[in-house]
C-alpha cells in the first residue's frame, strides 16, 4: 500500500503517519510544498525512533507524482463524496491520497477523479477527522482486505 500526503502542514501528523507506515510496511509519499522541514524536531518526535525507517518518497509537485504513477490506482480521501472507503475493493499496490489538513485535496483534483474519491462516514458536527487518524482507518481497511499482507 501507499499513503500519499499532498502538501501536509502539520509535522506531528506526518510523523505519526510515518510511524504507522513503518509498522505496516507501507510506502509514504510526500508532495511538496510541505508546511514544515523534514528535519523538524516535531516530525521526528511524532515518528519516535521510527522516522529513519520510513520508506519515504518526496515529490516536487502533484504533477511530478502523477506523471511517475500513471498506471497506479489512486484513491482520494475527502469529505466531499458519498462513496465510503469500506465499499472499495483495495489491492496491495493502491495509493490513498490525503490533502492538506486545513483545506483537503483541491476541488479540481477531486473533480477529475470523482469515481476514486472516498470518505470516512461521520456526523455533520465537524469538518473532518484528524489526518493521521484518517490515514490509519483507511490503511487498515485496505490491509484487512489484502489479508494483512505487509509486503511491498
Q: In which residue ranges do the predicted regions lie?
A:
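Post-transcriptional modification and biogenesis factors for structured RNAs
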Residues: 1-152
Amino acid at each position: 500500500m501507499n499513503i500519499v500526503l499532498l502538501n501536509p502542514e502539520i509535522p506531528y501528523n506526518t510523523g505519526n503517519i510515518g510511524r504507522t507506515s513503518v509498522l505496516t510496511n507501507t510506502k509514504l509519499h510526500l508532495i511538496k510544498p510541505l508546511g514544515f522541514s523534514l528535519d523538524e524536531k516535531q516530525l521526528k518526535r511524532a515518528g519516535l525512533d521510527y522516522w529513519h525507517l520510513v520508506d519515504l518518497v518526496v515529490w516536487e509537485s502533484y504533477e511530478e507524482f502523477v506523471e511517475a504513477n500513471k498506471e497506479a490506482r489512486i484513491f482520494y480521501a475527502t469529505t466531499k463524496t458519498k462513496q465510503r472507503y469500506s465499499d472499495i475493493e483495495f489491492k496491495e499496490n493502491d495509493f490513498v491520497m490525503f490533502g492538506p489538513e486545513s483545506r483537503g485535496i483541491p476541488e479540481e483534483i477531486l473533480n477529475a477523479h470523482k469515481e476514486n474519491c472516498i470518505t470516512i462516514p461521520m456526523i455533520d458536527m465537524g469538518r473532518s477527522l484528524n489526518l493521521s487518524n484518517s490515514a490509519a482507518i483507511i490503511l487498515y481497511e485496505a490491509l484487512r482486505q489484502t489479508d494483512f499482507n505487509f509486503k511491498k
